[in-house]
Amino acid sequence: MKTKKWNWISTIKINELYFDKIYLDYKKILDEPNANIFSENEDIYDSFIFEENGINSLIYFEKNGQFAGMELKNNLFYKDINLIGKDIEEIKKIFGYDSLVLDKYDSVDCDDIRAIFWFENNKIESVTVY
């Protein structure tokens, strides 16, 4: 799990973890002292929290081992552009959106690219990719 850079191809993969692929040994992927079960959401997901460069991030697997996504707070790259710290106008340009509007949770849900952008002080604080 330790990496300096998370390379995301929307709807397909992040680094070598493919969305919707089943990893029967997914707990081995997290086999490190700083990856701990964060929560179990009913019978749907196992969520693991791991620390990377002093920042907590989350990874999700469905109970059958299917990779369901991640929430990352640092070093998330899309086409060699680090998304963390970008403002909403920059996100519109990067992804070709005409308009994006923050919801009441200071987030933007972009179903077409399977991402939720979480903002704080008008800058991306984290991104959930699924």
Task: Annotate each language-model stretch with its function.
Residues 1-130:
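Short helix/turn-capping signatures at newly exposed starts of structured segments
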